[in-house]
Amino acid sequence: VKDEVVLCLNYDGKFGLNNINSYFQNANPNGEAIIWQSWRFKKGDKILFNDNSRFTYLYNNLKGIIVEIEKADDQIAFTIDVETIITEQQCKSDQIEYIDTIDEKTRIKLIVYAFDEDEVDDEENAKKTIIPFQLAYAVSIHKAQGLEYDSVKVVIPSVNTEKITKGVFYTAITRTKKKLTIYWSSETMEAIISGFSSEHNGFKSLEIIKNKLVQTTSSS
């Protein structure tokens, strides 16, 4: 599924988003990963923009897919399909190369430069060394606020039940437009849902949670 995400509670651990992102990137069949500093990227990787200090129109939480990667000694160029319309003029003002507009997406090329100790004290030059996006096969539930996907898979290990407040759970299960799958044990489900029932505030959100869980159970 192209528009799909795994939502995680933590960054680290077996079920953390770092490990899950690595798993899905390794499963990406588009050749070897390109290594840049501490980063690894492949063509076809799902990404989320997370730094808009350099680019006005590549805003925080903008979704994209890497189409091409061109690496040189002093720079790396990414061709990316971003899920928003950016005009050619807007790209020019952001110093991004406009390539095409395809199905409500814009194909762009941006360049990240190698770290240069002689220039990094200059704020504008320092911004050009930052990769402004992260891998996004898996995303933290907190980061997913405001995002929507056709398919959402939520991973809830039994060791993290104390972190699942009603608000966190509500955020996770309402990110989907079509399909929701929750990976948890029956004991974990019971502990979490019974905890929600003891909370007296947020009746509307509790009803939405119950309805979502009924739909998920019915479709599984």
Q: Where are the regions a protein language model picked out?
A:
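Core RecA-like ATPase module of SF1/SF2 helicases and allied nucleic-acid translocases
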Residues: V1-S220
